[in-house]
């Protein structure tokens, strides 16, 4: 089960107590306290995570609540911690952010010159991890697992990969968010400049493979190729979403807004 808010988790835990033996929680790499030692393992301490704001705090609170329930014998708990999930029909404006702008020949702004490393996982690998965890409670119970493809990629590299798959040129514009007056202390997915953070997120997913036999086999290129195949089948492409921070930066640079 997933939850954006810890009170959702509290309600679910109360409702399921005595009714289920194993609770698999869909968590996030946003629970980890920022560290300059990469990759982050499951033993990396919990936040606070300033970049993720309330989202990270609520995921941490949810996990703490569930681990308390596990310790009390309410049910077994497994936490699956994901980075950014990609795949066809993604409701989050990730692939669609890049594809729409690339096909329209629009500039894509890259905070910090796009050097930040981020990590992804394909939706089918996510599903495989969830199913496997539920099928192996004797191993997965009481454990947390990162689930991510092993090779991170820079933000610039990710956009260039999207452009290569589409067969178009990328119009990349490196920016300094602070200098343009559009910097933000926390991530607000309703008001972005770029869909991924400007701080490294790199997880170690080897425990998932070692203990549960789950391999995140779909690499960065194939993730984009699978999305591109879905994208090309859409009679009406997802509309470009407009963001105030992105438009403010474009205006400051003298570029047309979305």
Regions found by a protein language model. Give the residues of each.
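Mid/C-terminal beta-alpha module of Rossmann-like enzyme folds, strongest
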Residues: 133-193, 205, 211, 225-226, ...
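Substrate-positioning beta->alpha
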Residues: 92-98, 111-135, 142-143
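A short C-terminal helix-loop "cap" of Rossmann-like NAD(P)-dependent dehydrogenase/epimerase domains
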Residues: 45, 99-111, 168-173
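Short-chain dehydrogenase/reductase
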Residues: 38-64, 92-96, 119-120, 152
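NAD(P)-cofactor binding segment of oxidoreductase domains
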Residues: 1-40, 50, 63-68
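Conserved beta-loop-beta element that borders a ligand/cofactor-binding pocket
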Residues: 63-89
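Hydrophobic "lid"/C-terminal helical patch
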Residues: 66, 130-134, 162, 220, ...
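Conserved sequence/active-site signature of Rossmann-fold short-chain dehydrogenase/reductase
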Residues: 31, 85-87, 126
């Amino acid at each position: 089960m997933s939850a954006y808010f810890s009170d959702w988790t509290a309600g679910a835990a109360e409702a399921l107590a005595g009714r289920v033996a194993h609770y698999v929680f869909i968590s996030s790499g946003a629970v980890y306290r920022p560290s300059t030692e990469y990759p982050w393992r499951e033993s990396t301490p919990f936040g606070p995570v300033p970049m993720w704001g309330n989202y990270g705090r609520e995921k941490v609170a949810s996990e703490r609540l569930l681990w308390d329930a596990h310790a009390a014998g309410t049910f077994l708990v497994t936490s699956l911690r994901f980075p950014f999930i990609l795949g066809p029909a993604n409701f989050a404006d990730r692939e669609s952010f890049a594809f729409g702008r690339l096909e329209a020949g629009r500039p894509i702004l890259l905070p910090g010159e796009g050097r930040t490393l981020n990590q992804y996982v394909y939706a089918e690998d996510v599903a495989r991890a969830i199913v496997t965890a539920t099928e192996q409670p004797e191993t997965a119970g009481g454990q947390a697992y990162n689930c991510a493809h092993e090779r991170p990629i820079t933000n610039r590299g990710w956009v260039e990969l999207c452009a290569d798959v589409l067969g178009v040129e990328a119009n990349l514009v490196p920016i300094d968010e602070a200098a343009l007056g559009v910097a933000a202390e926390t991530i607000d997915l309703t008001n972005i400049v770029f869909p991924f953070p400007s701080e490294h997120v790199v997880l170690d997913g080897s425990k998932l493979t070692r203990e549960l036999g789950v391999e995140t086999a779909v690499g960065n290129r194939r993730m984009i190729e699978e999305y591109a195949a879905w994208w090309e089948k859409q009679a009406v492409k997802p509309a470009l979403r407009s963001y105030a921070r992105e438009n403010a930066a474009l205006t400051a640079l003298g570029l047309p807004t979305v």
